[in-house]
Amino acid sequence: MRVAVLGNSGSGKSTLAGWIAGYTCAPLLDLDTVVWEPGKIAVARSPEAARSDLHAFCSAKKHWVVEGCYASLIDTALEYSPVLIFLNPGEGQCISNCRARPWEAHKYASRAEQDQQLALLLSWVSEYYTRDGDMSLTGHQACFNAYTGRKVEVTVRPQLDPPSAEVLAWLN
């Protein structure tokens, strides 16, 4: 089982990908960990380095889950024919999820540091619907529409505990 999860910040990517990885015992790659310099906030690595790390992860494992908001990197993962899950729950749900987000220790040294970035994050989430590019609704829709493999667009929060029949069908 290979799964790629794509969506806006706050769409539920990390929650769903983490659940799938746990349920299937598959390794999980959060694309933020290959895009950004370790231990540095908003210091990007080269796109080539990120793609190289993603290829290394995908080619080394039979089963995996990757998640992120980077359409170009998801496109790279799609070369390995995963199920593509595009989370598109709408701006209100993404904002609500961001406000309720637990501390992301892999991104921030403290909860306080993360909270200092919340206003910027909420603005980023809202701009998703009007900007263009790799991390926009337009970019995500283009990635989703171009993929000819198994895929699903999810517009409501999936039921994970216990998993709904719909969620289990994505994994079969």
Model-derived regions, located:
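Walker A (P-loop) ATP-phosphate-binding motif of ABC ATPase nucleotide-binding domains
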Residues: R2
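Glycine-rich phosphate-binding loop used to anchor ATP phosphates in small-molecule kinases
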Residues: A50-I95
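A glycine- and Lys/Arg-enriched "phosphate-lid" helix/loop adjacent to the NTP-binding pocket
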Residues: P89-S136
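Hydrophobic anchor at the beta1->P-loop junction of P-loop NTPases
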Residues: V5
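The conserved Walker
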Residues: S9
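NTP-dependent small-molecule kinase module
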Residues: Y23, E127-N172
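Conserved lysine of the Walker
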Residues: K13
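Conserved substrate/cofactor phosphate-moiety recognition/catalytic segment
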Residues: G18-K62
